[in-house]
Amino acid sequence: MGEFSTLLQQGNGWFFIPSAILLGILHGLEPGHSKTMMAAFIIAIKGTVKQAVMLGLAATLSHTAIVWLIALGGMYLSRAFTAQSVEPWLQLISAIIILSTACWMFWRTWRGEQQWLAGNHHHDHDHDHDHDHDHDHDHDHDHDHDHDHHGHIHPEGATSKAYQDAHERAHAADIQRRFDGQTVTNGQILLFGLTGGLIPCPAAITVLLICIQLKAFTLGATMVLSFSLGLALTLVTVGVGAAISVQQAAKRWSGFSTLARRAPYFSSILIGLVGVYMGIHGYTGIMQ
């Protein structure tokens, strides 16, 4: 680390900027940077590329902010305020938010299915009722039956035989409405991304502290920004890849709709397991 300080003092630190970007990319590939969790979240909500980019940038923003907060706090508040001492608490806080998100995803999917099943049962009940009521009037029965059936299905753009597919299209439209055009839901995506980037990087904090101590504040900010840019490239690529893979699979595989209907359950369980894992590590670190 002494050689690095010497290079900075000689003004050669700017040569490390490309290396900082590359290290950020590689750093994003390391375990513990929420790539699996983010991909699962994008798949669960059938997220668009725009939402995947938003998720990755939010995670990078929080990751960078944590580096600055810990570095500056460590300098001006206390020597004990290090990345090693803060990381367990951040892991525990992240675990709580992640578990809450997983439970919300699971509940939202279950509620959507229950609402569809209730609506489908109500449709069948109305169909049987009309049939029994108009049994003695063949002309009226045919007219009422066709009219009621058409009125129920036409907004979905499908026939009774394809009603399940119509529901899936309606469910996809509901997801699009919830996660594309609403401020509240975009806030949920941003919150999830910000939570995913709360774990600090000791290497980035160390570089920033060295630059600040050597009065190379601008260089330190640039190095951290370059590092964060590389991290953003990795996280955004993972999210966009998940979003595109969902879209392509839906076009090429007819059975994908059935799998996609169950995917949010598996995704919420996977995200929940990640939250439990982070919570255990955070709790263990606090107790040490």
From Swiss-Prot:
GO terms for cellular component: plasma membrane. Residues 34-51, 107-188, 245-265 are cytoplasmic. The chain crosses the membrane at residues 13-33, 52-72, 86-106, 189-209, 224-244, 266-286. Keywords: Cell inner membrane, Cell membrane, Cobalt, Cobalt transport, Ion transport, Membrane, Nickel, Nickel transport, Transmembrane, Transmembrane helix, Transport. InterPro entries: Ni/Co_transpt_high_affinity (IPR011541), NiCoT_RcnA (IPR051224). GO terms for molecular function: nickel cation transmembrane transporter activity. GO terms for biological process: cobalt ion transport; response to cobalt ion; response to nickel cation. Induction: By nickel and cobalt. Transcriptionally repressed by RcnR. It is a multi-pass membrane protein. Residues 122-155 have a biased composition (Basic and acidic residues). It comes from the Bacteria. Residues 122-166 are annotated as: Disordered. Residues 1-12, 73-85, 210-223, 287-288 are periplasmic. It is found in: Cell inner membrane. Efflux system for nickel and cobalt. Belongs to the NiCoT transporter (TC 2.A.52) family. RcnA subfamily. This is Nickel/cobalt efflux system RcnA. It comes from Salmonella typhimurium (strain LT2 / SGSC1412 / ATCC 700720).
